[in-house]
Structure formats: structure tokens, C-alpha cells
Amino acid sequence: PDMYAFGL
């Protein structure tokens, strides 16, 4: 869900 977190 986060912009820069492993595609989450």
C-alpha cells in the first residue's frame, strides 16, 4: 500500500 514499500 505504500509508494516505496516493495509494491505494498
Swiss-Prot record:
General function of this protein: May act as a neurotransmitter or neuromodulator.
Keywords, alphabetical: Amidation, Neuropeptide, Secreted
Protein name listed in UniProt: Carcinustatin-12
Lineage top rank: taxon: Eukaryota
GO biological process annotation, one example: neuropeptide signaling pathway
Compartment(s) where it occurs, according to its Swiss-Prot or TrEMBL record: Secreted
Organism: Carcinus maenas
Gene Ontology cellular component list: extracellular region
Family named by the database record: Belongs to the allatostatin family.
Disulfide bonds: none
Chief location: secreted
Residues where Leucine amide is found: L8
